[in-house]
């Protein structure tokens, strides 16, 4: 979302006077006279009634009024501005309809970008900004990822508690429209806990697991097991279910669902989607150890009919998690490569061996090229001697 700088030609006193008159004319309980206590008191009074303009008026006109209020707010010293900014942010969350919600969103974005980047008030503005963006269905206009979020607060990082609160909000506003982004937010949230306070993050850890399992685009689930809050769930059903998605095959999930059907459903997880994901994860695991698989093997392992094998493999190839070739004539699947479901010591050793083999092959090629080059030089020299 773009935001233009705030520039108002009138002096502060003139702006305050005009705003007071404007809101009084709309019927607000406010004096048209400037306060003798200073501009901060004027702002408190103006912000207290500013939502009266939501009842009437065009969005463009209201945007101009809010812009004027913002232009005054950004002049208030930091030590006296917190209550004013918080009061304004709260008012902006009360827009009665979508067009005005977008006006309030733009106003908060303008305030956020015109505050000093080292101001701790930017956190509070951004938190309310996300709330309003959700109301307007424009969350991705203000939040595109964790890296972008961190860069915005680089000059004044919020406290761990503040970031936890913000991550929870971001998870809530993205979980219905972007599960992948929501899952990344929850993983980041769990990363803010330490060994000392991980035990109190039980609810966050459960939400993180459920979000990751429900996300159709998240397949590498092994890193979740290393998060401290997730470790505290060992022995719980949700941790058992995560472990199945990390390293077990489809039959293990089917058995778990038969034993704990109510639990799975109570977490908001869809059984058919779980089956689809577990089939893909099972296929990946089979591909790790079997460069060639028959359709018969896949029907047994994936619990599908033989005529469903080809469509299933095609769907797997679309994810780019596995590279393979279908051999319809011989009812086989030839695996070229696959992403590992887990990446532990064995996978690191395999990668080391592969890189070592590449290094040796490159050395052999280099030696061969050197020999060919030397031979060509010798041949050229001998031809010169003959002539």
UniProtKB/Swiss-Prot annotation:
Gene symbol of the encoding locus: Tango7
Assembly and interaction partners: Component of the eukaryotic translation initiation factor 3 (eIF-3) complex. The eIF-3 complex interacts with pix.
Protein name, UniProt field: Eukaryotic translation initiation factor 3 subunit M
Protein function: Component of the eukaryotic translation initiation factor 3 (eIF-3) complex, which is involved in protein synthesis of a specialized repertoire of mRNAs and, together with other initiation factors, stimulates binding of mRNA and methionyl-tRNAi to the 40S ribosome. The eIF-3 complex specifically targets and initiates translation of a subset of mRNAs involved in cell proliferation.
Family: Belongs to the eIF-3 subunit M family.
Subcellular localization, as worded in the UniProt entry: Cytoplasm; Golgi apparatus
Keyword Cytoplasm: yes
Domain PCI: from-to ranges: 181-340
Keyword Protein biosynthesis found: yes
Domain of life according to the entry: Eukaryota
Keywords: Cytoplasm, Golgi apparatus, Initiation factor, Protein biosynthesis
GO BP, one annotated term: Golgi organization
Pfam families: eIF3m_C_helix, PCI
GO cellular component terms attached to this protein's record: cytosol; eukaryotic 43S preinitiation complex; eukaryotic 48S preinitiation complex; eukaryotic translation initiation factor 3 complex, eIF3m; Golgi apparatus; investment cone
GO MF: caspase binding; cysteine-type endopeptidase activator activity; translation initiation factor activity
Organism this protein belongs to: Drosophila yakuba
């Amino acid at each position: 979302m773009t935001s233009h700088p705030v520039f108002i030609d009138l002096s502060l006193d003139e702006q305050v006077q005009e705003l007071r008159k404007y809101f009084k004319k709309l019927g607000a309980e406010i004096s048209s006279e400037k306060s003798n206590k200073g501009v901060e008191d004027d702002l408190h009074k103006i912000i207290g009634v500013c939502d009266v303009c939501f009842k009437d008026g065009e969005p463009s006109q209201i945007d101009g009024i809010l812009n004027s209020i913002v232009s005054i707010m950004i002049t208030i010293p930091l030590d006296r501005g917190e209550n004013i900014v918080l009061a304004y942010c709260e008012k902006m969350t009360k827009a009665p309809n979508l067009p005005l919600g977008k006006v309030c969103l733009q106003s908060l974005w303008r305030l956020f970008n015109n505050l000093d980047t080292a101001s701790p008030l930017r956190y509070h503005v951004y938190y309310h900004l996300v709330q309003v963006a959700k109301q307007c269905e424009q969350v991705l206009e203000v939040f595109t990822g964790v890296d972008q979020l961190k860069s915005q607060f680089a000059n004044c990082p919020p406290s761990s508690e503040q970031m936890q609160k913000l991550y929870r909000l971001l998870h809530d506003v993205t979980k219905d429209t972007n599960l992948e982004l929501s899952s990344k937010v929850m993983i980041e949230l769990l990363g803010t806990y330490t060994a000392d306070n991980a035990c109190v993050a039980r609810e966050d850890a459960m939400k993180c697991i459920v979000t990751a399992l429900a996300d159709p685009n998240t397949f590498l689930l092994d890193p979740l097991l290393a998060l401290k809050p997730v470790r505290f769930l060992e022995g719980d059903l949700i941790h058992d279910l995560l472990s199945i998605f990390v390293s077990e095959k489809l039959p293990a999930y089917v058995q778990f669902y038969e034993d704990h059907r109510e639990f799975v459903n109570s977490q908001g997880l869809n059984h058919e989607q779980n089956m689809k994901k577990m089939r893909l994860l099972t296929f990946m695991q089979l591909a790790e150890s079997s460069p060639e698989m028959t359709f018969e093997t896949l029907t047994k392992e994936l619990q599908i009919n033989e005529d469903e094998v080809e469509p299933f493999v095609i769907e797997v190839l679309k994810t780019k998690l596995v590279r393979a070739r279908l051999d319809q004539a011989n009812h086989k699947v030839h695996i070229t490569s696959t992403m590992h479901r887990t990446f532990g010591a064995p996978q690191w050793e395999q990668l080391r061996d592969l890189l070592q083999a590449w290094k040796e092959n490159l050395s052999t090629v280099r030696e061969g090229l050197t020999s060919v080059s030397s031979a060509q030089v010798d041949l050229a020299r001998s031809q010169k001697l003959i002539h």
